[in-house]
Amino acid sequence: MRYFLELRYNGAAYCGWQRQPDMPSVQQTLERALTTLLREKIEVTGAGRTDTGVNASYYVAHFDCEEPVPDPAQVVYKLNFLLPGDIAVGSMTPVGADAHARFAAREREYRYYIEPRKNPFTRDATWQYYVPLDMDRMNEAAAALLEYDDFTSFAKLNSNNKTNICRIMHAAWTADERGVLCFTIRADRFLRNMVRSLVGTLVDVGRGRYTPDGFREIV
């Protein structure tokens, strides 16, 4: 029997979603809790990888178990007691055997925050960067991302990606009333460390190291 889980997590204490040898991951932590609760070996498949330290406000994963779970809501209740405080499960839903958390996901969205001042309360959730940035130039460069689909320039070296092709639907910077910048990017898939690499290069545009046209040449 297959089930979808909807969850959220604070990734500060984890190497990312995917299981890694000798490193804490969200996937491994969730599998251990489910295995304990359901009393059988459980392997969980996620909608995609998230990098070290990345938070997820809405994430979907699936797992298979031998017997149907009579009360999924009760499992969610108990699961949240077993899991550490930085991982929360919102729901558990029975699905068909061919439903797949990764292959069924049509798009994924990242939000990356840059705070222009030191703030001890957001240091784990924002990049605190104190150099003034030109958001108009950064948005001009970000808009160019929709024109390309090969992001080899922003792929992690020596990764095992079968392809570096990604289709980006949206990429833009906004600022709130406190001056905190937010980069929102939505695509069908992301490469490992791709978002961080993009943000770093766009920040270089914002501080004048590259022009928007120079950014295009990098892409």
Language-model features, listed with the residues they occupy:
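Structured-RNA-binding interfaces characteristic of tRNA pseudouridine synthases
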Residues: M1-V219
